[in-house]
Amino acid sequence: MSKEQFLRNKPHVNIGTIGHVDHGKTTLTSAITSVLKLKGCTEKSYSYEDIDSTKEEKKRGITINTTHVEYESDLRHYAHIDCPGHADYIKNMIIGAVQMDGAILVISLEDGPMPQTIEHLLLAKQIGIKKLVVFLNKEDKVDDEEIIFFIKEETKSMLDKYGFDSTLTPLITGSALKALEEIKLLKEIDLNNKWISKVINLIDTVDSYIEKPERNLNKPFLMPIEDSFYITGRGTVVTGRIENGIVKLNDKVELYGYDKSKLTSVIGIEMFNKGLSQGESGDNVGLLLRGIIKEDVKRGHVVAKPKSLKFYSEFKATLYILTSKEGGRTNPFKIGYKPQFFIRTLDITGEIKKLYSTTNENNTLELAIPGDNINANISLSKSIVLEKELRFSVREGGKTIGHGIIIDLIK
């Protein structure tokens, strides 16, 4: 029996829920899918347990790529990332493995913005999310309009502080849990129900405010590998988000590891357990590769058009060093510093070999001070595929301390 085919009849957008623990991110994800099913836009809804159990399975290593929930609105097809309890959540946000085109920031009206709210907002800005919609959840628990007004003002101030325009960013109040409860109580479809209509308002706002990104369809195919698994009798599947180009069934591709590569071909393409004849830039897909064993593949490897990439271990980059207020270091670092470099889906140790002015390579520097915009020569512990203009993050001790862009490749 052939697998159901994925129908590409609406623009595809990657979105995610971010915010403090227990503010209702997973409940909201469930409510969105349930309301859209009620409207007849999407076939499947997900319960809280559906979404939460996939996180537990992921922790135990049973399933792959379960952080994505699929749904359709009137206008779009969405891949929705909901993994607040996932061990790699922060890491994945940073490296862009679950790169989002936009986000829904969930804040409980019982608590207002909390430490993790700020952490996720800062991360969203750091990984290049330009627009988000705020959902002020648990409105049913707060009957004081002054408290709601105060939290809205506090949220606007926080948005401005971290580079999101509060005059443009939509703030929507509602209760994800009440919407789910009301759907269960309904004897007939009522989209005007107070709590259900608020979730519909959120979905419509996401449709209109979060812009559809430009996809790099004309560049050579490239997909950083987020995960892989072996299907008995079929072979190895690699999962990830296609960064550039298009891949079709039976295309020849090259699997790039550390300083070595292997030619293979694509014998299966899937998105959300549905077959595809081709995957496109922006799609979260699984690719079944011919003749590849699981041991050939690691997270951070890249699958791409043959002979389109080269290996490098040393490069020049322009760095911005975050200040302590931006979540970075309080102290400067010097030549010989060895942090982690998060490049695509890979995190790898590297060493700062040289620090110098962005305007004059001969103007060498002894220290990189938080707040500096400087150039550096960086040597990685292994050779990997790199390109000019590739962006990366620099991490140390569980926090981001800088961002960079490759300006030249050395060796």
From Swiss-Prot:
Membrane spanning residue stretches: none
InterPro entries per record: EF-Tu_GTP-bd (IPR041709), EF-Tu_GTPase (IPR050055), EFTu-like_2 (IPR004161), EFTU_2 (IPR033720), G_TR_CS (IPR031157), P-loop_NTPase (IPR027417), Small_GTP-bd (IPR005225), T_Tr_GTP-bd_dom (IPR000795)
Ranges where the tr-type G domain occurs: 10-214
Binding sites annotated in the UniProt record for GTP: 19-26, 82-86, 137-140
Reactions performed catalytically: GTP + H2O = GDP + phosphate + H(+)
Region entry G3, spans: 82-85
Compartments, record wording: Plastid, Apicoplast
Class in the EC hierarchy, top level: hydrolase
Protein's name according to its UniProt entry: Elongation factor Tu, apicoplast
Organism expressing this protein natively: Theileria parva (East coast fever infection agent)
